Amino acid sequence: MKQITFAPRNHLLTNTNTWTPDSQWLVFDVRPSGASFTGESIERVNIHTGEVEVIYRASQGAHVGVVTVHPKSEKYVFIHGPENPDETWHYDFHHRRGVIVEGGKMSNLDAMDITAPYTPGVLRGGSHVHVFSPNGERVSFTYNDHVMHELDPALDLRNVGVAAPFGPVNVQKQHPREYSGSHWC
């Protein structure tokens, strides 16, 4: 057994699917405080050499974390908090999304539509703990609903969802925080 990260910061592994398909790298997020969702990068470390690479760096005040790896290719999925957070829209269970990074390019996994009439295949809130299926075609996640939270926070119960590769799913934006995604949820 050996330690492979040494930088003076918190390195957090998700509790599943953190190995790259070649079993040479572990992926993690980096947080100033281990208890807060305030990390700005998704990274990986080579278990033999200790080399660290940044997979993704957030911008515009967004935070990222809870990364997992595709079982067959170098594709990463993780939580991305809102860009340009403010008093009314900041990181929260119902204000986050799943994103996929492949080949250095980031795309939204899930879409969000919080304005009626709602778009089929689109979430109304935030997703969390994204994990690829064993064949890599689907992604499981947990989910909190912004619309239900606005109605009554007690109604915003966490649910389990699946993102299927039947996208893209395009949202006709009626709210500045709505967005399109690559998968049907």
Predicted ranges, named:
Residues 1-185:
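Sequence signature of WD/YWTD-type beta-propeller architectures
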